[in-house]
Amino acid sequence: ARAFVMDMGRESQAAYGSIHARRYHQDEAISTVQDWLAEHLAESIRIDQLAEHFHMTPRTFKRRFRNATGDTPLRYLQQLRVEKAKKLLEQPHRRLAEITRAVGYEDTSAFSRLFHARTGMTPGAYRSRFLPSTPSG
């Protein structure tokens, strides 16, 4: 079972936040896009191609997406990837390079910078929160 994590030493709980609140809106086309993004995280995704895939102009797509979710499509995608990476980081046997590729990035250092910018923690620091503590003695 997953535990709810609260880090009392932090002013922000952003590292442990979730993207699920951004799913409650009335735009069915954007809900379909969100489902598609969740299924294709490991792929290289360009926003203009995504708009075309869902039969919208890039401008209309970005406007509708932001109106529905409160985020730009790129920021939403990045946050979705960070959320997936968090789940994978909770598995101690998964290497960071493998996780980076699994969420659609090739460059581990670029992904680490994004992860830190979104959570306030490095991937390693985030992972350490879920490792069993060893008794000191």
Predicted regions and their residues:
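An amphipathic alpha-helical interaction segment
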Residues: 1-21, 32
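Short amphipathic alpha-helical surface patches that mediate protein-protein
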Residues: 2-6, 116, 131
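Basic, amphipathic alpha-helical hairpins
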Residues: 11-14, 29-46, 65-69, 86-95, ...
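N-terminal positioning helix adjacent to the helix-turn-helix/winged-helix DNA-binding module
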Residues: 22-33, 69, 78-81
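Terminal helix-turn-helix DNA-binding modules in bacterial transcription factors
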Residues: 43-49, 56, 66-108, 128-137
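Key DNA-contact positions within bacterial/archaeal DNA-binding proteins
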Residues: 59, 109, 124
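Short hydrophobic/aromatic patches on the structural cores and recognition surfaces of FHA
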Residues: 61, 85, 111
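Non-catalytic terminal regions of proteins
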Residues: 81, 112-113, 122-127
